[in-house]
Design a protein with these regions (language model features):
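C-terminal catalytic/substrate-binding lobe primarily of soluble NAD(P)-dependent oxidoreductases
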Residues: 1-2, 8-178
Length: 178
């Protein structure tokens, strides 16, 4: 009896699925996009019926996707990839840079699952990052690292009294979370 790979089924006669790996990706739009949604919702005006941004409407630009590593002796470092729309479309016509970078991680996870079918459920940091990055690399564009002197307190405008720790800018109390 054949079953879809890598689903694991019980050994009894009913053959029910006891393990079926899944991938999940969560994305949060940038602050300007969220602000735009709030403005539309709060305006009291009905939004247009529908507008889907087509691939042809994206004529230039790119995406910087990375992580800010902070709180160490050198302050903070942004590490990530920069992919232009032209580079993305050279890899896959009608695609965009953000989609290419993001789905490269999903592709890497799927390859890892296919190559490690008996590992069961694992956290992302338990996967072989070297192998995953090798799968992702063609879809990431330029990989860059940049140090910065930015801190959560650098450009803060305190219009109202707030708790903050001026002795260590990297304390959680200094971050504004919404």
């Amino acid at each position: 009896r054949r079953h879809s790979f890598p689903t694991r089924r019980s050994s009894d006669l009913d053959g029910r699925a006891v393990y079926r790996p899944t991938c999940h990706y969560a994305y949060h739009p940038c602050n300007d996009a969220i602000l735009s949604l709030h403005e539309i919702n709060g305006s009291g005006i009905l939004p247009e019926n529908k507008h889907i941004l087509t691939a042809d409407e994206i004529v230039s630009g790119g995406d910087d996707l990375g992580v800010l590593l902070y709180g160490h002796a050198k302050g903070a470092m942004w590490y990530g990839s920069r992919l232009s729309i032209a580079e993305a479309r050279a890899l896959a016509p009608y695609q965009n840079a953000t989609g290419m970078q993001v789905t490269s991680a999903v592709l890497a996870a799927m390859v890892w699952v296919a190559e490690n079918p008996n590992m069961g459920f694992v956290e992302a940091d338990e996967m072989d990052h070297v192998r995953c990055l090798a799968v992702q690399r063609p879809y990431l564009g330029q990989i860059e690292a940049h140090y910065t002197d930015w801190t959560p307190l650098s450009h803060r405008i305190n219009r109202f009294a707030s708790d903050q720790d001026d002795s260590d800018p990297w304390q959680f109390i200094n971050f504004l979370a919404t």
